[in-house]
């Protein structure tokens, strides 16, 4: 399957891990999707989920200056996860920032409120500079 679908699954895994009642490990959360999606790029999913979870404070510090009158904690959970994922991938992969940003916008359109993709795109545009 495509990298795009792997990003969707990484997002859903991170969302699951963010639930207050969740005591799942990263590997346990990822294992839930393996049985139903054997063609996904699980190496990429694990890299992205582990990277985001392992670097949350640094990612939040990177994102925060561009939030304009917002804090990370006030963002919708979906937006916070998407920003962290995209920021991590922009900073730690060879994938062109433009591709990562486009995928983040598409995730936002799929999982967040109607116009939030504009906000996500604006924040990521500043981060990639």
Swiss-Prot record:
SS bond list: none
Keyword Transcription annotated: yes
UniProt entry keywords in alphabetical sequence: RNA-binding, Transcription, Transcription antitermination, Transcription regulation
Keyword Iron-sulfur on entry: no
Pfam families: NusB
An MF annotation (GO) of this entry: RNA binding
Gene3D superfamilies, A to Z: NusB-like
GO CC terms of this entry: cytosol
Entries under SUPFAM superfamilies matching the protein: NusB-like
GO terms under biological process: DNA-templated transcription termination; transcription antitermination
Family to which this protein belongs: Belongs to the NusB family.
Its job: Involved in transcription antitermination. Required for transcription of ribosomal RNA (rRNA) genes. Binds specifically to the boxA antiterminator sequence of the ribosomal RNA (rrn) operons.
Protein's name in the database: Transcription antitermination protein NusB
